[in-house]
């Protein structure tokens, strides 16, 4: 009996641990959030850019039918009408094709899933043609009725966990995930996505759902589809949106036993550092000492689709594409540092925080336009196509699991470190030049700085760094240069 219990416990532990695995293809790391992109465009991006540049995954916007709202704001995607795969990004056939094409080039798909709630009042018509009556909690496209929702109440006090989890977030009709029928419908929806070949989920508004209910839902999910290259028995990677800056009734620690969490403290802290409110020298103990969840439970980012607009957490400290020099430095640090599972943001430009993606006619999403230097236009920012970011994804892949070594700082805002003997980075956020002989940890030779340029054959389009037989190199980063970071690695050796 004891042996049987032990086996059951070990089996449960194996299942639990499996959902912390990103399911990335070997030798790849780092995902990108292609916010509001169309499925056909993502498929092409996987084949033409993400795959060749070593990206491991793509987070996509919600895939299921949402309410059509006036002026088509981005947040309409977070107001579900049904679980039909029909949105402005495309239909089920297009989504299935995208997942297959991305998997074929080693890029995994992670879906932003919304099942805390359904649409708020006014969301009577959906992108797939379904109708609903949010005011009476009737969503025939699922179908859900008033029996499937929590009683109507507002969230006014984040120190009351019951209110946060049982009441309505900004008027969105709050589903009761403890209801077995709701659980059935959610599992059916997620399992369908698993059948189509996705690798995991970002669970929207997880903080507003009871961990015990989520545990039931996650525990019922089928294993990943081996036809898409996943190992037998693999579980979906789960990352839960839990905004925990401290001082509230709900803690991320209630969720880290179930999956990874969106570590908003990382975003807030990295913004403060590279905006000059904290010194770079303090980054020497970056990680859990800063109040972050454990590395394998932390999805880390510089900004996300919410907090780049002032929603969520971080406020004015959050760095976005609108502060490009510091944004590139913070992104390079995140990708160079071994902590967490990094996610790169890929935005559309906005001046109004409600503004939706670029369209051709006010409704249909426009495709990004690509320039000769890899950057985007047509209203798309495409931070993932900035050389300083995509070359650091390659850096992360090159250094693998090698530890941080050879830490150096000037007691202020100049730092450098190596990742074992495979990569080296230096940062200058002071208002004077960095000019020092530093230990890179790398083998002797000439290396291409992958921030100022790229390795092209046996030459470099940017600066080069000469490493001596002792591993040292003269590192220069002028305070007025376009980039306050320099990076070299073994795959960029000339």
Curated annotation (Swiss-Prot):
Modified residues (Pyrrolidone carboxylic acid): 19
GO molecular function: alpha-amylase activity; metal ion binding
Assembly and oligomerization: Monomer.
Named cofactor requirement(s): Ca(2+); chloride
Residues engaged in binding Ca(2+): 116, 165, 174, 208
Enzyme's top EC category: hydrolase
EC number: 3.2.1.1
Keywords attached to this entry: Calcium, Carbohydrate metabolism, Chloride, Disulfide bond, Glycosidase, Hydrolase, Metal-binding, Pyrrolidone carboxylic acid, Signal
Signal sequence, renumbered to the chain: 1-18
UniProt site positions, description: Transition state stabilizer: 306
Superkingdom of source: Eukaryota
Active-site feature positions: 204, 241
InterPro entries: A-amylase/branching_C, A-amylase_C, Alpha_amylase, Glyco_hydro_13_cat_dom, Glyco_hydro_b, Glycoside_hydrolase_SF
Annotated source species: Drosophila yakuba (Fruit fly)
Name the UniProt record assigns to this protein: Alpha-amylase A
Gene that this sequence comes from: Amy-p
Paired cysteines (S-S): 46-102, 153-167, 376-382, 448-460
SMART domains documented for this protein: Aamy (SM00642), Aamy_C (SM00632)
Catalyzed chemical reaction(s): Endohydrolysis of (1->4)-alpha-D-glucosidic linkages in polysaccharides containing three or more (1->4)-alpha-linked D-glucose units
GO BP, one annotated term: carbohydrate metabolic process
Cofactor note: Binds 1 Ca(2+) ion per subunit. Binds 1 Cl(-) ion per subunit.
Family: Belongs to the glycosyl hydrolase 13 family.
Residues annotated for chloride binding in this entry: 202, 304, 343
